[in-house]
């Protein structure tokens, strides 16, 4: 089991979750974070820290967002590891809660 970052992180990229991760399993893209499924220890510390409520246990990923399970695994292999909190993206508050942001994902 692992945790998964989903759609609402895109264009927000709050990094509160990164700070609490005991195994540093977050990876950072231009406008999105992902969790490496082979490194996550399922501790659940990150989930309540996400202001965008974009992190879910793999077995609780909302319907229609199952593609994020594979996407997290794929992008964690190519993006750099992030271990410290950074400022959210400038328009994070504007984008928080907007549906269908997968088209805005920058690889």
From Swiss-Prot:
Gene Ontology molecular-function annotations: 3 iron, 4 sulfur cluster binding; 4 iron, 4 sulfur cluster binding; electron transfer activity; metal ion binding
Gene3D superfamilies registered for this protein in UniProt: 3.30.70.20
Amino-acid positions noted as binding [4Fe-4S] cluster in the UniProt annotation, renumbered to this chain: 21, 40, 43, 46
Taxonomy, superkingdom: Bacteria
Keywords carried by this UniProt record: 3Fe-4S, 4Fe-4S, Electron transport, Iron, Iron-sulfur, Metal-binding, Repeat, Transport
Cofactor(s) for this UniProt protein: [4Fe-4S] cluster; [3Fe-4S] cluster
Cofactor note: Binds 1 [4Fe-4S] cluster.
PANTHER family, per the entry: FERREDOXIN, OXIDOREDUCTASE
Role summary: Ferredoxins are iron-sulfur proteins that transfer electrons in a wide variety of metabolic reactions.
Protein name, per record: Ferredoxin 1
Name of the coding gene: fdxA
């Amino acid at each position: 089991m692992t945790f998964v970052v989903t759609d609402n992180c895109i264009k927000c990229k709050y990094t509160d979750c990164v700070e609490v991760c005991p195994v540093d399993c977050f990876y950072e893209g231009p406008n999105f974070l992902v969790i490496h499924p082979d490194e996550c220890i399922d501790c659940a510390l990150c989930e309540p820290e996400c202001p965008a409520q974009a992190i879910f246990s793999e077995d609780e990923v909302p319907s229609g967002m199952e593609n994020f399970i594979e996407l997290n695994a794929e992008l964690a292999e190519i993006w750099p590891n992030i271990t410290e909190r950074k400022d959210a993206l400038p328009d994070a508050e504007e984008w928080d809660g907007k549906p269908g942001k997968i088209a805005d994902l920058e690889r």
